[in-house]
Swiss-Prot record:
Binding site for ATP: M183, L184, H208, F209, R265, G287, Q296
GO biological process, one term: tRNA 4-thiouridine biosynthesis
Residue ranges constituting the THUMP domain according to the UniProt record: 60-165
Pathway: Cofactor biosynthesis; thiamine diphosphate biosynthesis
Family annotation (CDD domains): PPase_ThiI, THUMP_ThiI
Protein's name according to its UniProt entry: Probable tRNA sulfurtransferase
Family: Belongs to the ThiI family.
Record field: catalytic activity: [ThiI sulfur-carrier protein]-S-sulfanyl-L-cysteine + a uridine in tRNA + 2 reduced [2Fe-2S]-[ferredoxin] + ATP + H(+) = [ThiI sulfur-carrier protein]-L-cysteine + a 4-thiouridine in tRNA + 2 oxidized [2Fe-2S]-[ferredoxin] + AMP + diphosphate; [ThiS sulfur-carrier protein]-C-terminal Gly-Gly-AMP + S-sulfanyl-L-cysteinyl-[cysteine desulfurase] + AH2 = [ThiS sulfur-carrier protein]-C-terminal-Gly-aminoethanethioate + L-cysteinyl-[cysteine desulfurase] + A + AMP + 2 H(+)
SUPFAM superfamilies documented for this protein: Adenine nucleotide alpha hydrolases-like (SSF52402), THUMP domain-like (SSF143437)
Cell compartment(s), UniProt: Cytoplasm
Keyword Ion transport (UniProt): no
Amino acid sequence: MQYSEIMIRYGELSTKKKNRMRFINKLKNNMEHVLSIYPDVSVKTDRDRGHVYLNGTDYHEVAESLKEIFGIQAFSPSFKVEKNVDTLVKAVQEIMTSVYKDGMTFKITAKRSDHSFELDSRALNHTLGDAVFSVLPNIKAQMKQPDINLKVEIRDEAAYISYENIRGAGGLPVGTSGKGMLMLSGGIDSPVAGYLALKRGVDIEAVHFASPPYTSPGALKKAHDLTRKLTKFGGNIQFIEVPFTEIQEEIKEKAPEAYLMTLTRRFMMRITDRIRENRNGLVIINGESLGQVASQTLESMQAINAVTATPIIRPVVTMDKLEIIDIAQKIDTFDISIQPFEDCCTIFAPDRPKTNPKIKNTEQYEKRMDVEGLVERAVAGIMVTTIQPQADSDDVDDLIDDLL
């Protein structure tokens, strides 16, 4: 028998009450985006569960995609069969014979939304249970935590049978918590921060700073590839490339070496905040982890944060590096992140950066520069690209490949 659909059980949506349908509709849109690589697959949702109709598409491929979509608590592949007792008996016997192994226990869980069906739920449980015993006489029934819980649902159009319950990604549907700007470098931490923000329903746009010729086309492609890895959790992501060469050259010329990193990060924060404002974002997200590098001490964070009143979300701030690496490997960004391309945060990194920068000092050094003009020119020069889950590359990547 071939699976015909996958039944979706929602995650935290069950707590949303009045906003429930808004969350469900967003989850439906996200599933349609991610599953768009399977042209025959269709998605339907209602208040209680979702349905992914396979229409002949390979179940295993679709299931792997569903495992990554936030807002799904669990899902079950189902067989669609004709709605009569004889057909149900034969289907249940065939399924149980194929999955049973010595010593396993089972139960039948039947329910019907079509109350015109000839048997009620209790009678159907008994009938199908007897059918299993007739082909597997040594099997034992167990009502609590059986090895096989065969679920039979009688709907208006057909009957559906399932026995697997596969854990989903949990979390909230991407986009239900508003939009945030992810400061995406080429490192290990920021893609993980983006993933964790997506899990809590934040619709992210990736802001990446490029400083050619100091940063290479390879570094830009690396950032594109990291963004594409994140699209499998909720669909398309807008990638925003910011020209940053002029600012970094200005900082290097006008400021003491020990303050280069602090000033660089303050400019990045200003620009990201300006982009957030222009694009109706609510928060800024970054991959800072407390104490990991010089710019991530509390004193440094305070000095950098001082340029904005916008909330800054740091999903990995309390994690050890190995914890972050574990997540990066899980979401398949680690191998990309360790590719040896320098980014804006490393090209002019001082040997001994200031770990406890004073805000008044940073403000004094910034008076040597046209801060507003530099920010305005950077924001005016941004390039926005849509990164899609189904594409192996895009026009910008093709151009980068030519340059490489």
